[in-house]
C-alpha cells in the first residue's frame, strides 16, 4: 500500500532511541524526508545512520517549550516544510505523590506538556495554510490508566491529551489531523530502566509501533483525527 507520504517532510522529536527512533525509521522507509533530534550528538548521529534515507540529525533538547520551538524551526530550515510532526519526549522521574516534591512538577509539565504545545504552535499554522498536515503525539497509556509510581508523568500527560483533542477539533476540515498514540510496555531503553525485571516476551516491538505512527501520517488517515490509539497488546480493557 502506498501511504502517500513519499517526499513529505517529517520532524520526529526525541528519536535517538526507542519509539521515536522506530517511528522515524518507519517514516523514512515510506520515503519521507526525515529530521530527528536528540540531546547527545553521538547518539543522534548513530540513530540517523540507522534510520537511513538521508535522515538529518539535529542536536536539540525538547524537554521544554523553547527546545520544542527550536526543533521545529531548525527542521523547517532543513526540510522547507514540516508536513508530518511526531512529538515525543522522555518521561519525568518516577515517584509517588508522597515522595515527589512540589517543585518537581513544573519540569515535568514543561517536558510532557509545554514542549508538545510549542512544537504544535511552531508547525500547525503553516500546515493549515498548506491544507495538509499530520500531528502524531507519542504519549502514554497512563492517560487512560494511571501507572503506579509515575505521578509526574500521569499528571502531565493527561494535560497534553486534552490539548491535542482540542486542537484536533479546531483544525478539523483544514486537511490537518491531530492524533495521539498511547504505548503500553515496549522493548525500549526507558521501559528497561523502569521495569527491568519484567518478562520481555510480554512487551511490544518498537518497529510495529512505528508502523502505526506512519499510518496516522498517511493520506489514508485523512478522516482520523482527535483519536487516542492505545498500543498495548490488549492490556487496557475498559469499555470507554
Pin down the residues of each PLM region.
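Conserved glycine-rich cofactor-binding loop
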Residues: 9, 16-17
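Short, small/polar-rich loop/turn modules that mediate ligand/substrate recognition or access, typified
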Residues: 86, 172, 177, 224-226
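Substrate-binding pocket helix/loop in short-chain dehydrogenase/reductase
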Residues: 96-97, 104-109, 135, 191
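Active-site helix of classical SDR
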Residues: 120, 156-157, 164
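Alpha-helical segment proximal to the catalytic Tyr-Lys
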Residues: 125, 169-170, 222
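Residue(s) in the substrate-gating loop at a strand-loop-helix junction
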Residues: 140
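Short C-terminal tail/terminal secondary-structure segment
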Residues: 145, 214, 225-240
Amino acid at each position: 500500500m502506498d501511504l502517500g507520504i513519499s517526499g513529505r517532510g517529517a520532524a520526529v522529536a526525541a528519536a535517538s532511541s526507542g519509539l521515536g527512533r522506530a517511528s522515524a525509521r518507519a517514516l523514512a522507509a515510506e520515503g519521507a524526508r526525515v529530521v530527528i533530534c536528540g540531546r547527545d550528538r553521538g547518539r543522534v548521529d548513530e540513530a540517523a545512520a540507522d534510520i537511513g534515507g538521508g535522515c538529518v540529525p539535529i542536536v536539540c533538547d525538547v524537554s521544554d517549550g523553547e527546545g520544542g520551538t527550536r526543533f521545529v524551526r531548525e527542521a523547517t530550515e532543513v526540510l522547507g516544510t514540516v508536513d508530518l510532526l511526531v512529538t515525543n519526549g522522555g518521561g519525568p522521574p518516577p515517584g509517588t505523590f508522597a515522595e515527589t516534591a512540589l517543585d518537581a512538577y513544573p519540569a515535568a509539565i514543561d517536558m510532557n506538556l509545554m514542549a508538545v504545545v510549542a512544537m504544535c504552535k511552531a508547525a500547525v499554522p503553516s500546515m493549515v495554510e498548506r491544507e495538509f498536515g499530520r500531528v502524531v503525539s507519542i504519549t502514554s497509556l497512563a492517560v487512560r490508566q494511571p501507572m503506579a509510581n509515575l505521578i509526574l508523568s500521569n499528571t502531565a500527560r493527561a494535560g497534553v491529551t486534552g490539548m491535542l483533542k482540542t486542537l484536533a477539533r479546531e483544525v478539523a476540515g483544514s486537511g490537518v489531523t491531530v492524533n495521539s498514540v498511547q504505548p503500553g510496555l515496549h522493548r525500549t531503553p526507558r521501559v528497561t530502566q523502569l521495569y527491568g525485571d519484567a518478562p520481555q516476551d510480554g512487551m511490544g516491538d518498537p518497529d510495529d509501533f512505528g508502523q502505526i505512527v506512519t499510518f496516522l501520517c498517511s493520506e489514508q488517515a485523512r478522516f482520523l483525527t482527535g483519536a487516542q490509539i492505545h498500543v498495548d497488546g490488549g492490556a487496557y480493557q475498559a469499555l470507554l
